[in-house]
A protein has these predicted regions:
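Glycine/proline-rich active-site loop of Rossmann-fold NAD(P)-dependent oxidoreductases
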Residues: 185, 198-200, 210-226, 234-237, ...
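A conserved structural motif in NAD(P)-dependent oxidoreductases
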Residues: 251-255, 332
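Amphipathic terminal alpha-helices
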Residues: 23-26, 333-375
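C-terminal "lid/loop" region of Rossmann-like NAD(P)-dependent oxidoreductases
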Residues: 243, 273-274, 282-289, 296-314, ...
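Non-catalytic, hydrophobic alpha-helical segments
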Residues: 256, 260, 276, 287, ...
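Conserved active-site helix of classical SDR/Rossmann-fold NAD(P)-dependent CH-OH oxidoreductases
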Residues: 98-99, 185-192, 225-229, 258, ...
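N-terminal Rossmann-like NAD(P)+-binding domain of SDR-like oxidoreductases, especially those catalyzing
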Residues: 1-208, 364, 375
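Hydrophobic "lid"/C-terminal helical patch
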Residues: 17, 260-264, 291, 319, ...
Length: 375
């Protein structure tokens, strides 16, 4: 029987990975620190009772050592995410926590045979674009000075023409233009480099925007579908940054879990980052409108001229590589939204945490506003 450790296994993706592995006959151990920002009510009821559960932090050396004992394959999902203003915590959890896990495996000569690490589309600075003159280009992040003028478009780095969004391949430049994105670059590079040095197979899955049942209703810093739903269910308008026409690639969580299992069981992706997504870009405004219609709550989204520096305008994943080995998303956006709404309506005491969080981000300089110019 294969023995797996799922770090972050109480969260959205980790818990679905654990469920899938249990169904497939794996012996599963879950490690999660039950971060209060995500798990405000403590241990969630959905943790699989056929999996061993360890409540603890991967930054604690003894805890991660115990969690790794007799493990064959690690699904490293644990991360601190979103746009929260705690820079040091991102680095401690995402970068140093990952480094410590790798150190412990080597130090104790543990029999780990593979690591699948959760990366993110946030590693890209901006999605790929098609320039009328230069073809596919990889623009840099849009300058703050441009955004302050309300110019949201992405321009060709060679001729400044407005580009058309196209799917972004894995060979696009990475760098991360947010603290979260930067630490996800750290995570994937650490794991892939360590794999090359040790000869232990590793693969980094660059997830698109993942949503579905169990997405935290308490965390106002990440998960646009959850944030919009909690706003609407409190009779508040979803707040759109920029003009709402920015696009994202959305993936249902069960599809992401299947991608993890596929990556664990094939050697065709080893040693590299791999995009996982639907391959389709959807405007954020459309997401807000679909949720409003599905919930039957007629509240138009609010656009107030705010933006977040470093945020990409468009990102759709080029999923050619993972599709070539048999991956195909099963759940489209309409079905996924319907299933998420069924789940969130079953939750109690749904509150709006976004309003307070947005004010914190403004005060911390993470959210900016368009500067109006006189005549």
């Amino acid at each position: 029987m294969k023995r797996a450790l799922v770090t972050g296994g109480a969260g959205l993706i980790g818990s679905h990975v654990a469920d899938l592995l249990v169904r497939e006959g794996w012996e599963v151990r879950v490690l999660d620190n039950l971060e209060p920002q995500t798990h405000r009510r403590g241990r969630p009821s959905w943790i699989n009772d056929r999996a061993e559960f360890i409540e603890g932090d991967l930054r604690d050396r003894e805890t991660i050592s115990a969690a790794l004992d007799k493990i064959d394959i690690v699904f490293h999902q644990a991360a601190y995410g979103g746009y929260m203003p705690e820079i040091a915590k991102y680095v401690h959890v995402n970068s140093l926590g990952t480094a410590q896990m790798l150190e412990v495996i080597c130090e104790k000569n543990l029999p780990v045979r593979k690591i699948v690490v959760a990366s993110s589309q946030a590693v890209y600075s901006e999605g790929a674009g098609d320039c009328p003159e230069h073809g596919m280009v990889f623009p840099s992040v849009r300058p703050v000075e441009q955004l302050r003028k309300g110019d949201w478009e992405v321009h060709c780095p060679l001729c400044s023409a407005i580009t058309r969004s196209v799917p972004t391949p894995e060979n696009a430049p990475v760098g991360g233009e947010t603290v979260y994105g930067l630490t996800k670059v750290d995570q994937e590079k650490l794991v892939l480099l360590w794999g090359k040095q040790t000869g232990i197979p590793t693969v980094a899955l660059r997830y698109s925007c993942t949503y579905g049942p169990r997405q935290s209703i308490f965390n106002p810093y990440t998960g646009v579908i959850a944030i919009f739903c909690t706003r609407l269910l409190n009779n508040l308008a979803p707040v759109l940054y920029e003009d709402g026409e920015q696009t994202r690639d959305f993936s249902f969580v069960e599809d992401i879990a299947r991608a993890n299992l596929l990556a664990a069981e094939t050697d065709k992706l080893d040693g590299s980052p791999v995009n996982v997504g639907s391959g389709t870009g959807t405007p954020i405004r459309q997401i807000a409108e679909q949720l409003s219609a599905a919930l039957k709550i007629d509240i138009a989204p609010e656009i107030n001229g705010e933006f977040r520096p470093g945020e990409m305008r468009h990102l759709t994943s080029d999923t050619t590589r993972i599709r070539a080995i048999g991956y195909k998303p099963d759940v489209d956006l309409a079905e996924g939204i319907a299933r998420y709404i069924d789940w969130i309506r079953s939750q109690s005491d749904i509150r709006d945490y976004f309003s307070e969080a947005a004010e914190i981000l403004r005060n911390k300089g993470i959210v900016h506003k368009v500067q109006k110019t006189g005549r």
